[in-house]
């Protein structure tokens, strides 16, 4: 079993436990919280496993985990903007918060693009990745506390379930598109945004 497979196997169990621990939120909110938890675990694994800039196995682990994180974050952001923020921007009570969240997505995408253009062995790669992790954590914290609370005030459970169905379909499409684009790469080996 490769180092990456070993890490992913451990994370699969933790992700399942995290999803089971989520209680109370309906529809798209629960889905988004579950995805946030999974990406957080993958990001932690990069920081835990990928520190040696000269070890080929550590670099391969870093490369594969980042590829998964990259696809997860980009598919999540595009789908969330399209299906969740799009609805919230139509409501005066949630418009500003949803717009702010989209701005944070652009900042996250910028950091992903910076990492795309760096070799995983570059000394600046891990500090840039750590910046990405901090930006994602801050975004998730704001979203799950502030935006989700506001969304619960303007959307009923039926609407949250409908948005969830559309979100999941959009995410599958974006994920397939991003995975297909992996064959069209930059010098670093990552797909373009």
Residue map of PLM features:
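Small-residue-biased structural context
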Residues: 1-193
